[in-house]
Amino acid sequence: MIISAASDYRAAAQRILPPFLFHYMDGGAYSEYTLRRNVEDLSEVALRQRILKNMSDLSLETTLFNEKLSMPVALAPVGLCGMYARRGEVQAAKAADAHGIPFTLSTVSVCPIEEVAPAIKRPMWFQLYVLRDRGFMRNALERAKAAGCSTLVFTVDMPTPGARYRDAHSGMSGPNAAMRRYLQAVTHPQWAWDVGLNGRPHDLGNISAYLGKPTGLEDYIGWLGNNFDPSISWKDLEWIRDFWDGPMVIKGILDPEDARDAVRFGADGIVVSNHGGRQLDGVLSSARALPAIADAVKGDIAILADSGIRNGLDVVRMIALGADTVLLGRAFLYALATAGQAGVANLLNLIEKEMKVAMTLTGAKSISEITQDSLVQGLGKELPAALAPMAKGNAA
């Protein structure tokens, strides 16, 4: 099979993975409108082509939280990574490390912090949810600090799980889910051998270490469902800010006022994100939300963005819309499921090449030169002008 883009990895992953796993990573909430808009809105952003600029000294390097990045990309926190490839978090982290970008470990990873951190040279980032069990949160923070994690990514857009209809149909949840998953696994031999048999243990490493017992998929669903905390407020986050002395990033911002609150709170960064369309369907895509947020807080706080990014051109688009760095989620997971560490490494090389093409043809020699001037019509107050015709069409 020829691999030339993330879409090729997606097609391969769909063949390799049991349906319950593929649709868990590929699906979104409700009718998946926001999931689709994330990709489609970003693809509508038009860039200005500029020529004869002498781009021989082009550079993708950037700095974030005093870390040097080979390009303005980090791997996003993705739960259950170790179910998509054998010890998947370790493989993805190694690929990111070799490319000179950060890897973010999810709270609900298969591999625990203590397994992933020693496998790479650069400090990884750690993602934490807002949970009722504050003892677990403190324990996770202590372990992250002990392992040398440099940045905390605090996810705030999951006070309750989203309604993901695909999961019920695919076997991730719903009637007879365990039996359906078993039948799917035995009919996907490549995954069954590589991950199902040789990727054990399939515990949720960070949780089982705290609970003191193995935690499988059913435990994951049950424990998380009982621990999401809808009562959380900015006030409740103060003890985390006091406890964590490294950079802290608030993930799940879609409104300029929430971005301003993050600045007032003292966060070091925000992630403009709708959780990949997996939480509230019908909210703005990240591409639409980003310009107004950048207009409100650019320069006061680091702005990261995710949701809908599938290639290097999308990275350039997000930066032109106001992001400093982007997070890759599904794109790297497709590659991981297909070819493990080598797949992720190849995807990152593709993204780097695609960025270089886009920057060369827009006349941006450095990341700092990718601005709203790189867009065909600049920025509107709420969404890029290049998206305005589409928005009008949707309203008709």
From Swiss-Prot:
<comment type="function">
    <text>Catalyzes the conversion of L-lactate to pyruvate. Seems to be a primary dehydrogenase in the respiratory chain. To a lesser extent, can also oxidize DL-alpha-hydroxybutyrate, but not D-lactate.</text>
</comment>
<dbReference type="InterPro" id="IPR000262">
    <property type="entry name" value="FMN-dep_DH"/>
</dbReference>
<dbReference type="GO" id="GO:0009060">
    <property type="term" value="P:aerobic respiration"/>
</dbReference>
<keyword id="KW-1003">Cell membrane</keyword>
<dbReference type="InterPro" id="IPR012133">
    <property type="entry name" value="Alpha-hydoxy_acid_DH_FMN"/>
</dbReference>
<feature type="binding site">
    <location>
        <begin position="306"/>
        <end position="330"/>
    </location>
    <ligand>
        <name>FMN</name>
    </ligand>
</feature>
<feature type="binding site">
    <location>
        <position position="106"/>
    </location>
    <ligand>
        <name>FMN</name>
    </ligand>
</feature>
<dbReference type="InterPro" id="IPR020920">
    <property type="entry name" value="LldD"/>
</dbReference>
<dbReference type="Pfam" id="PF01070">
    <property type="entry name" value="FMN_dh"/>
</dbReference>
<keyword id="KW-0997">Cell inner membrane</keyword>
<keyword id="KW-0560">Oxidoreductase</keyword>
<feature type="binding site">
    <location>
        <position position="278"/>
    </location>
    <ligand>
        <name>substrate</name>
    </ligand>
</feature>
<feature type="binding site">
    <location>
        <position position="127"/>
    </location>
    <ligand>
        <name>FMN</name>
    </ligand>
</feature>
<keyword id="KW-0472">Membrane</keyword>
<feature type="domain" description="FMN hydroxy acid dehydrogenase">
    <location>
        <begin position="1"/>
        <end position="380"/>
    </location>
</feature>
<dbReference type="GO" id="GO:0006089">
    <property type="term" value="P:lactate metabolic process"/>
</dbReference>
<comment type="subunit">
    <text>Forms homooligomers.</text>
</comment>
<dbReference type="GO" id="GO:0042355">
    <property type="term" value="P:L-fucose catabolic process"/>
</dbReference>
<dbReference type="GO" id="GO:0010181">
    <property type="term" value="F:FMN binding"/>
</dbReference>
<keyword id="KW-0285">Flavoprotein</keyword>
<dbReference type="GO" id="GO:0005886">
    <property type="term" value="C:plasma membrane"/>
</dbReference>
<dbReference type="InterPro" id="IPR013785">
    <property type="entry name" value="Aldolase_TIM"/>
</dbReference>
<keyword id="KW-0288">FMN</keyword>
<feature type="binding site">
    <location>
        <position position="155"/>
    </location>
    <ligand>
        <name>FMN</name>
    </ligand>
</feature>
<dbReference type="GO" id="GO:0004459">
    <property type="term" value="F:L-lactate dehydrogenase activity"/>
</dbReference>
<dbReference type="InterPro" id="IPR008259">
    <property type="entry name" value="FMN_hydac_DH_AS"/>
</dbReference>
<comment type="similarity">
    <text>Belongs to the FMN-dependent alpha-hydroxy acid dehydrogenase family.</text>
</comment>
<feature type="binding site">
    <location>
        <position position="24"/>
    </location>
    <ligand>
        <name>substrate</name>
    </ligand>
</feature>
<feature type="active site" description="Proton acceptor">
    <location>
        <position position="275"/>
    </location>
</feature>
<feature type="binding site">
    <location>
        <position position="129"/>
    </location>
    <ligand>
        <name>substrate</name>
    </ligand>
</feature>
<protein>
    <recommendedName>
        <fullName>L-lactate dehydrogenase</fullName>
        <ecNumber>1.1.-.-</ecNumber>
    </recommendedName>
</protein>
<feature type="binding site">
    <location>
        <position position="164"/>
    </location>
    <ligand>
        <name>substrate</name>
    </ligand>
</feature>
<feature type="binding site">
    <location>
        <position position="251"/>
    </location>
    <ligand>
        <name>FMN</name>
    </ligand>
</feature>
<dbReference type="InterPro" id="IPR037396">
    <property type="entry name" value="FMN_HAD"/>
</dbReference>
